[in-house]
């Protein structure tokens, strides 16, 4: 029986796979251990890890709310953890947050419009653009080689944090993040 839905935000298609905006889905790829996600009639790709259902919405990030909401209804699950990029956190930083605003993140806004704002988030810091690059171009670009090393370690830690849902729920995730040193910026 599914107890938690863990949704990794990102955009669909191979051209977005390695972009900053897709770090939430990158965490799910680590958790899947190479297993293939299956398509669900609610426009999601999913993979069950027992009591945790990993979900990749098959919609652009700013349209992810309706597909996540329909899957939650289908499985009668009320506990949601959303994995997403955050430009307000330095590269390599992880933060757990229960409820709250969207900070301008369109994927979170879409989810909040459908479900309200009382859901958990695991924020993955991607840093801010430099050299007057627009935020849109920045989040849709790939990481540099140095940044890739940092974000790879961060994504691994985020995947480990998600597994703490099994034993201690959201408290376990929060405690793991608080006790873990985020990969340092170089």
From Swiss-Prot:
Q: What is its EC number?
A: 3.1.1.29
One GO cellular component term:
cytoplasm
GO biological-process terms attached to the record: protein quality control for misfolded or incompletely synthesized proteins; rescue of stalled ribosome
Question: Mind telling me which residues the site (Discriminates between blocked and unblocked aminoacyl-tRNA) is annotated on?
Answer: 11
MF annotations from Gene Ontology: peptidyl-tRNA hydrolase activity; tRNA binding
Reactions catalysed, semicolon-separated, are: an N-acyl-L-alpha-aminoacyl-tRNA + H2O = an N-acyl-L-amino acid + a tRNA + H(+)
Q: Which Gene3D superfamilies match?
A: Peptidyl-tRNA hydrolase (3.40.50.1470)
Predominant location category: cytoplasm
Which residues are catalytic? 21 (proton acceptor)
Q: Do you know which PROSITE patterns this protein is assigned to? A: PEPT_TRNA_HYDROL_1
The entry's family comment says: Belongs to the PTH family.
* NCBIfam families for the chain: pth (TIGR00447)
Oligomeric state and interaction partners are given as: Monomer.
Task: Indicate what this protein is called per its UniProt record.
Answer: Peptidyl-tRNA hydrolase
Task: Name the gene that codes for it.
Answer: pth
């Amino acid at each position: 029986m599914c107890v938690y839905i863990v949704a990794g935000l990102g955009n669909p298609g191979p051209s977005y796979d390695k972009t900053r905006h897709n770090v939430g889905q990158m965490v799910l790829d680590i958790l899947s251990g190479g297993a293939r996600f299956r398509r669900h009639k609610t426009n999601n790709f999913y993979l069950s890890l027992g009591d945790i259902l990993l979900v990749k919405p098959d919609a652009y990030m700013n349209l992810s709310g309706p597909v996540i909401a329909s899957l939650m209804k289908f499985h009668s699950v009320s506990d949601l953890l959303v994995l997403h990029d955050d430009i307000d956190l330095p590269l390599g930083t992880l933060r757990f947050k229960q409820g709250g605003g969207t900070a301008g993140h369109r994927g979170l806004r879409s989810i909040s419009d459908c479900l309200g704002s009382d859901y958990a988030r695991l924020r993955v810091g991607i840093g801010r653009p430099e050299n007057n690059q627009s935020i849109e171009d920045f989040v849709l670009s790939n990481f540099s080689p140095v940044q890739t090393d940092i974000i790879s370690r961060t994504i691994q830690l985020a995947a480990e944090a998600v597994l703490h849902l099994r034993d201690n729920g959201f408290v376990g995730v929060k405690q793991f993040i608080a006790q873990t040193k985020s990969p340092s910026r170089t």
